[in-house]
């Protein structure tokens, strides 16, 4: 048994969002050498077409020939860390591609990934987030992150099916006694 990494963007000079087979091979090999046997890398906020390519190549990585299976960490899922996030709490995400939660776009990305998207970060205060969570919580883990959400909005998101937080206390309002936030 080894470690499982569910939030990293890249390593060994490559980024998961490079979306190339070479990047995935290098990332998988590096992670395995570090004792990480299973990975769920996070994407950046990119165009839909680029995200489709990233998703398709991630799926292709899971279908490597048997002889190559032991050369890299097992890719157990994709974490879409955008584009359905808050502009105000975007962090290093590209603002040009930030958009409101869109069920149909997610389904297109999931189709490109052959169902490999396991986790998606959204800002629950954005238009469309409530419907997104309601419709997709039984199909994918929904993570609250890159958000300006207050406590009540976050509570509703978790009540509706969100079940994870992306880098808690980072890219969200600070925790205070009068405004506990996420």
Segment roles from a protein language model:
Residues 51-69, 132-141:
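Short, electropositive alpha-helical surface patch
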Residues 20-23, 54-57, 102-104, 178-182:
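Charged helix-capping and loop-helix junction motifs
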Residues 9, 25-54, 72-86, 113-125, ...:
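Divalent metal-dependent hydrolysis catalytic cores, especially in the metallo-beta-lactamase
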Residues 19-23, 94-98, 163-164:
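A glycine- and small-aliphatic-rich helix-loop capping segment at beta-alpha/alpha-beta transitions
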Residues 86-112:
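Conserved phosphate-binding/catalytic loop of the ribokinase/pfkB sugar-kinase fold
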Residues 111-182:
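Active-site core of metal-dependent hydrolases
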């Amino acid at each position: 048994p080894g470690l499982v990494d569910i939030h990293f963007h890249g390593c060994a000079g490559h980024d998961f969002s490079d979306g190339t087979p070479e990047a995935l091979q290098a990332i998988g090999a590096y992670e395995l050498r570090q004792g990480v046997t299973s990975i769920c890398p996070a994407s950046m906020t990119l165009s839909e077409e680029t995200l489709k390519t990233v998703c398709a190549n991630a799926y292709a990585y899971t279908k490597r020939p048997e002889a190559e299976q032991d050369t890299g960490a097992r890719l157990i899922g994709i974490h879409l860390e955008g584009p359905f996030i808050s502009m105000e709490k975007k962090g290093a995400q590209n603002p040009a591609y930030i958009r409101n939660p869109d069920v149909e776009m997610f389904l297109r990305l999931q189709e490109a990934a052959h169902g490999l998207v396991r986790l998606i970060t959204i800002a629950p205060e954005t238009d469309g987030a409530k419907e997104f969570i309601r419709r997709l919580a039984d199909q994918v883990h929904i993570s609250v992150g890159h958000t300006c959400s207050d406590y009540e909005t976050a509570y509703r998101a978790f009540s509706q099916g969100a079940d994870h937080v992306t880098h808690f206390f980072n890219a969200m309002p600070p925790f205070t006694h009068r405004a506990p936030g996420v």
